[in-house]
Amino acid sequence: MAPDPWFSTYDSTCQIAQEIAEKIQERNQCERRGEKTPKLTLTIRTLLKNLKVKIDLLKDLLLRAVSTRQITQLEGDRRQNLLDDLVTRERLLLASFKNEGAEPDLIRSSLMSEEAKRGTPNPWLCEEPEETRGLGFDEIRQQQQKIIQEQDAGLDALSSIISRQKQMGQEIGNELDEQNEIIDDLANLVENTDEKLRTEARRVTLVDRKSTSCGMIMVILLLLVAIVVVAVWPTN
């Protein structure tokens, strides 16, 4: 399996930084002895330029790996920490290079850190999680893609649930609208029925009055007939 290009570049960059630190130390020792160092100075300048190019390449590779989800966010953060250390070391080496005739503690600390990292090309692997321990780069990428697919499936399921809940809410709203329409129809029916009852009540009252008037007229007519009969009835 082909090695990870990012770590291959990282290892070579660390070697360049180590070489620069050693060359600066050698130059400073020569200058303390009164020796001229134009060749060493030129070599250090060239190595510093190469170091900057390598660091820029590491930045591009890391950005591409994170943006295309070839690595997890945790792995990206770890690589970014390593890259930040390299950038800091580059600045320290450049400052030490410009400080001619001096050998600051920065050079010695850089040498010690590089010695400590020898034999451990990928120092962050000691903190590698159990899920990816022993897996190759392609296997880790497949595992990450599987995790992303599972997350996408979970988001799709959540979206489906939200859609169903929204649809249920719309159906409940429609049912409430229908019930409100039924209640409005019942209210109109009750109002119309009440109006009809009032109309019929007025009619009954009118009929009752008419009935009372007709009864009185009949009584009066009967009385008149009785009077006439009594008047014309012969008496002895």
Swiss-Prot record:
Q: Which residue ranges are assigned to the Vesicular compartment in the record's topology?
A: 233-236
One GO biological process term is: early endosome to late endosome transport
Q: Residues bearing Phosphoserine?
A: 160
Isomerase listed as a keyword: no
GO molecular-function annotation terms? chloride channel inhibitor activity; SNARE binding; syntaxin binding; ubiquitin protein ligase binding
- Report which residue ranges the record marks as coiled coil: 42-65
Report membrane topology. Single-pass type IV membrane protein
Keyword entries, A-Z: Coiled coil, Membrane, Phosphoprotein, Transmembrane, Transmembrane helix, Transport, Ubl conjugation
- What InterPro entries does the annotation carry? Syntaxin (IPR045242), Syntaxin-8_SNARE (IPR041875), T_SNARE_dom (IPR000727)
| Residue ranges annotated as Cytoplasmic topological domain | 1-215
What residues does the t-SNARE coiled-coil homology domain cover?
145-207
Intrachain S-S bonds: none
Q: Give the stretches traversing the membrane.
A: 216-232
Q: Which Pfam families match?
A: SNARE (PF05739)
Q: How is it modified after translation?
A: Ubiquitinated by HECTD3.
Return the GO cellular component terms, semicolon-separated. early endosome; late endosome; membrane; perinuclear region of cytoplasm; phagocytic vesicle; recycling endosome; trans-Golgi network
Q: Where in the cell is it found?
A: Membrane
Q: Which domain of life is it from?
A: Eukaryota
Known partners and oligomeric status? Forms a SNARE complex with STX7, VTI1B and VAMP8 which functions in the homotypic fusion of late endosomes. Part of the SNARE core complex containing STX7, VAMP8 and VTI1B. Interacts with VAMP8. Interacts with HECTD3. Interacts with TPC1.
Q: What does this protein do?
A: Vesicle trafficking protein that functions in the early secretory pathway, possibly by mediating retrograde transport from cis-Golgi membranes to the ER.
Q: Which family does it belong to?
A: Belongs to the syntaxin family.
Protein's name in the database: Syntaxin-8
Organism from which the protein derives: Mus musculus
